[in-house]
Amino acid sequence: MAVTTSCTGSAPGNGGVAAGKPGTAGVGDRLFPGLGNGGYDVVHYGLTLDYVPETNHLKGTAIITAQATQDLSRFNLDLSGLRLRSTTVQGAKAQVARAGDELLVTPAKTVRNREVFKTVVTYDGTPRTLKDDDGGLEGWMETDDGSTALGQPSGSMTWFPGNHHPSDKATYDTTVTVPKDEDGDPYDVISNGKLITEEDKGKTVTRHWRTEEPMASYLAHVSIGYFETHKGRTDDDVPVYVAIDPDEAEDSADVPDLVPEIVDWASKLFGPYPFSSAGAIVDHLPGLDYALETQTKPYFGEAPEEALLVHELAHQWFGNSVTPREWKDLWLSEGLATYAEWLWEEERGDRGTTEIFEDYYDGTDTESEGIWAFPPADPPGAGRVSDPPVYGRGAMVVHKVRRAVGDETFFDILRTWTRQHRHGNVDTRQFIALCESKSGKDLSALFNTWLFDEKKPSRM
């Protein structure tokens, strides 16, 4: 791998540097070994962006507040493309080298273990769209009236530097300035969390959004374009912000009412809604073959079916608030969100969850194709992490737990899971332990058969 050095400061002196050691490049994720970085935990991202839709040019300043987990002589940040303009650590110029999508940052002085330190990176350029391991598109994508940024699993590094792995969650302030269009009309700028300020400066509009709860970087999001906005509140007084592209308005007419209805319904089953705002973004991005549970406002490239809306909103509990520590445990997000779809269908008086389970087992459900390709908790590679076993068979595991422990214990398990691990990271072992603790049963045979076994289980 070629390494090039950028001119962002003089090499540090010997004093203080030798006492520390470099943080690791990557956090040891089996499926994505290059994602994330060791040696520090990010506390907060302050992102200030200037974007010109007509030229797709982005200029950014990232203020990254982190706490060292060791004495750091050097640490890495993930950034794909974009020109690096300057980097400081604790106000002093840092030396930076680039190795692919890694920034190797050497501060002027060693950062001491447990020290809270601030890194400021300025950058600009044309942000990239990436093709991930399963062939899907992510990163910064142009739309017919602006752009959008989608991050799973690593696309967020195309528009801001950071520690891009779900095990390192942080709060965010995202401020975006966009010039008005040629007719003098403002673009809408939408991001995660609550809208804090909106400023019309004549030729430009600036919006400042804030996430008050920790967020994995793959859930960070910006959409720029023209939207019809709808505001409301849930029964628990959570503010709801729904933005719909005019091209999708007719087919999305029920979305503004469905979002608070689904959030209220899910809160009764899974526990209190975990964030201080809710909503959805329905954009017009033909060719995008997925939706994404971007935190507080799931993103859809077209008008969503009701079941898909349920799925992405359920992720606010399972995946966004309670986040897998490694990508191999993604079934904890996707299996539970898929099961939420089943519960919603049951609530609506259509198929019951047992009937859906049987349809999946028999292969008669349209979503059941390929679910026996591998165990849900053991995807064979990065390109398979979003395959049907993680979703459909993952939901079947959840249903088998429900049948084994009974409804009262099952929903107690779900509410305890979201309460105990609120805004944290989890793994499969913890979920199994909770199921066994709450039920008082040895469930090893169930999990070995349905979650870990390579073969399609016999009908039981």
Residues of each region from the PLM?
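Beta-strand-rich interaction surfaces with strong enrichment in secreted/lumenal proteins
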Residues: 48-49, 93-94, 106-111, 159-164, ...
